[in-house]
Amino acid sequence: MMEKSKPNVVFVLGGPGSGKGTQCANIVRDFGWVHLSAGDLLRQEQQSGSKDGEMIATMIKNGEIVPSIVTVKLLKNAIDANQGKNFLVDGFPRNEENNNSWEENMKDFVDTKFVLFFDCPEEVMTQRLLKRGESSGRSDDNIESIKKRFNTFNVQTKLVIDHYNKFDKVKIIPANRDVNEVYNDVENLFKSMGF
């Protein structure tokens, strides 16, 4: 019997407001991948009223990173629920501990291909987020939370990107452009990788 091939995973990283969600939606539409947003999974869990939910709520509001094992468990459940698919994991791993937990718990189940990094200047992201905050109703689209999220990204998430860079597994996309120009690069990258 042939061994079932492991699903491919691409980590989608970039500062808050760099356009990760928008670009993931395009990849889903054109390549049939499943988009797993760590933040969305955590927000759903928070609303489910589980015991993890309350802790998650407090941490998100404070711009803190939820314990890795909680997020990895939610991601693994979502991957198990979508057999035979490839996955975009958006907004994770946010720090080295996240990444270590992912590698310990997931390396036998998935093939982590590369990090898709949307590189965008902070002032551009801030403008986008404040605009989104007018309509999104997200508790973290305000200037205080935004500053904390940039800090988390600059201090912690960049170390994850450096880690994957050592293995030549980071694809950088300049994201301070028209959304269609950005996607053009993404689409060409995915085609060149044989997806």
From Swiss-Prot:
Keywords: ATP-binding, Cytoplasm, Kinase, Nucleotide-binding, Nucleus, Pyrimidine biosynthesis, Transferase. ATP binds at residues 17-22, 132, 177. It comes from the Eukaryota. Its EC number is 2.7.4.14. It catalyses: CMP + ATP = CDP + ADP; dCMP + ATP = dCDP + ADP; UMP + ATP = UDP + ADP. CMP binds at residue 98. One of its GO terms (cellular component) is nucleus. InterPro entries: Adenylat/UMP-CMP_kin (IPR000850), Adenylat_kinase_CS (IPR033690), P-loop_NTPase (IPR027417), UMP_CMP_kinase (IPR006266). Its cofactor is Mg(2+). One of its GO terms (biological process) is UDP biosynthetic process. Residues 131-141 are annotated as: LID. It is an enzyme of class 2 (transferase). A ribonucleoside 5'-phosphate binds at residues 43, 64-66, 91-94, 138, 149. Monomer. Belongs to the adenylate kinase family. UMP-CMP kinase subfamily. Consists of three domains, a large central CORE domain and two small peripheral domains, NMPbind and LID, which undergo movements during catalysis. The LID domain closes over the site of phosphoryl transfer upon ATP binding. Assembling and dissambling the active center during each catalytic cycle provides an effective means to prevent ATP hydrolysis. Catalyzes the phosphorylation of pyrimidine nucleoside monophosphates at the expense of ATP. Plays an important role in de novo pyrimidine nucleotide biosynthesis. Has preference for UMP and CMP as phosphate acceptors. This is UMP-CMP kinase. It comes from Dictyostelium discoideum. The gene is pyrK.
